[in-house]
């Protein structure tokens, strides 16, 4: 029998263990540090930050060592050449590791885009000096457009995120394409040059991609065999490579040797991956407790300076809790995770019993616990913990959360408009009562939904076209409205970035193709 890998105590059962069997000291989980900033604001990965203080790796070599093949055989073998100085993530013998073949989305269609396309200006008051040449590229698309360069390319999935100014698409053949902002290499093309229109990621041409996720400046991609590739910003360890390289512009496999991964998600500066057994792992910045390890990673480095201890490798979440009416905190046993969704600084999970847990930054009530307190470990959202009241789908926005119940009702909590009153616990969205929701996505403050034969959106001012209402129509709406510019077009899936929307429009019949041909083409200017 193969030698068993070192196993830690229950709290850290699959957490990193120092090579040679030594438990790492408390307060040094990830070894990463970050520059302080006001604790009340949202994490900002694009601001200028001081390089982390060099720390000596456990193998004694100077500097942060980067292994030759992250996540490869050397890292997997307990006594192999890559075992020294690396963390053991799973505690099971090699022969118990399952082999799986994941399937991507069954939907097929053409990509449509609307919203802001000046990628370097999104979420900023002005374009950074180093991107000044691109200042006048891109525009606000107030209605749906087709990318002229894509022709009739068939797409099965589109991906962005509420913090992201970049986007991804997965073709019907499983190829991953990317475009948008690229200051940290988050497009995976091996450079940091902005890309105006979708372009295939050549480094992943040999892989069949089934899912992907976008953070503020980083990206994760999942292959059909359950392997995860990461690229983009890694200053806070959000790529799971065991180091804090500022940027990794080419796809690199994460340092993980557990069961195959089948779901993933990205927050602003952290990442979540879920294995096929229902275990959840997190890595990146621990601010607000968003990693779920019962700590916000905060420590005082010196006078007037707070830093954060980042998780540089995937670490399993070992504790799920519920709070009783009298304030007792009790562990919830046997949680098997089935889905995960990440907002900017919070996370939702759906388990096998249709329960919802949330944790991270509690501002605006986005966790659904009727209070604004940050949660350091996954906490049960009470509303969905009743027979017949469970959740079937979960979605996380920048400062809000959504869930579709098993009976089809849409529930919302948090805030899309942070200048108005927040919803502190899940409430039914009456405007969408009776609609069968197929797909939902959130931007910074806007929401788009694919339901029945319609596409629906809403969001407060300012908007940049991501609601898709058209050139000569109101640009914002605080109530849900049908997107009339997509009348007669069946939307398979929706995705939303910080202030742009992506839609997969079905093109199976001649009539559907004819409707799509009538939409305007978008051919962005390039330098």
Language model features: what each stretch is:
Residues 2-527:
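Eukaryote-biased RCC1-like beta-propeller repeat architecture
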């Amino acid at each position: 029998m193969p030698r068993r890998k070192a196993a830690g105590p229950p709290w850290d059962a699959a957490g990193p263990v120092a090579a040679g069997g030594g438990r790492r000291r408390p307060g040094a989980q990830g070894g990463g540090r970050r520059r302080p900033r006001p604790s009340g604001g949202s994490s900002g990965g694009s601001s200028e930050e001081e390089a982390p203080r060099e720390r000596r790796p456990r193998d004694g070599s100077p500097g942060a060592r980067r292994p030759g093949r992250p996540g490869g055989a050397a890292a997997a073998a307990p006594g192999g050449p890559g075992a020294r100085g690396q963390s053991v993530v799973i505690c099971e013998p090699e022969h118990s590791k399952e082999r799986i073949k994941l399937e991507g989305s069954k939907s097929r269609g053409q990509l449509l885009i609307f919203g802001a396309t000046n990628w370097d200006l999104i979420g900023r008051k002005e374009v950074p000096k180093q991107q000044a040449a691109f200042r006048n590229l891109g525009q606000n698309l107030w209605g749906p457009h087709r990318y002229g360069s894509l022709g009739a390319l068939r797409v099965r999935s589109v991906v962005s995120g509420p913090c992201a100014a970049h986007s991804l698409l997965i073709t019907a053949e499983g190829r991953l394409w990317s475009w948008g902002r690229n200051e940290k290499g988050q497009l995976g093309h091996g450079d940091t040059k902005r890309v105006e229109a979708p372009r295939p990621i050549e480094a992943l041409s040999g892989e069949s991609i089934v899912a992907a996720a976008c953070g503020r400046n980083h990206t994760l991609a999942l292959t059909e065999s359950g392997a995860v590739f990461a690229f983009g910003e890694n200053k806070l360890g959000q790529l799971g490579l065991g180091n804090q390289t500022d940027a990794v512009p080419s796809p690199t496999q994460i340092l993980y040797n557990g069961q195959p991964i089948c779901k993933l998600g990205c927050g602003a500066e952290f990442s979540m991956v879920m294995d096929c057994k229902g275990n959840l792992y997190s890595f990146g910045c621990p601010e607000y407790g968003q990693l779920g390890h019962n700590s916000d990673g905060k420590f005082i480095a010196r006078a007037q300076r707070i830093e954060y201890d980042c998780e540089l490798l995937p670490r399993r979440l070992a504790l799920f809790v519920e709070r009783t009416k009298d304030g007792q905190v009790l562990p919830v046993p046997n949680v098997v995770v089935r889905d995960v969704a990440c907002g900017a600084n919070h996370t939702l999970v759906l388990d096998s019993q249709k329960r919802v847990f949330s944790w991270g930054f509690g501002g605006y009530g986005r966790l659904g616990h009727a209070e604004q307190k940050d949660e350091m470990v996954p906490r049960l959202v009470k509303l969905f913990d009743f027979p017949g009241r469970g959740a079937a789908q979960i979605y996380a926005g920048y400062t809000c959360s959504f869930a579709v119940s098993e009976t089809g009702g849409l529930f919302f909590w948090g805030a899309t408009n942070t200048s108005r009153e927040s919803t502190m616990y899940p409430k039914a969205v009456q405007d969408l009562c009776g609609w069968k929701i197929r797909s939902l996505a959130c931007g910074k403050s806007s929401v788009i939904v694919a339901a029945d034969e319609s596409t629906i959106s809403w969001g407060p001012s300012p908007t940049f076209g991501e609601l898709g209402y058209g050139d000569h129509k109101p640009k914002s709406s605080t109530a849900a409205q049908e997107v009339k510019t997509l009348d007669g077009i069946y939307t398979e899936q929706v995705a939303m970035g910080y202030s742009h929307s992506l839609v997969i429009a079905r093109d199976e019949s001649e009539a559907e193709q004819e409707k799509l041909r009538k939409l305007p083409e978008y051919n962005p200017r390039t330098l």
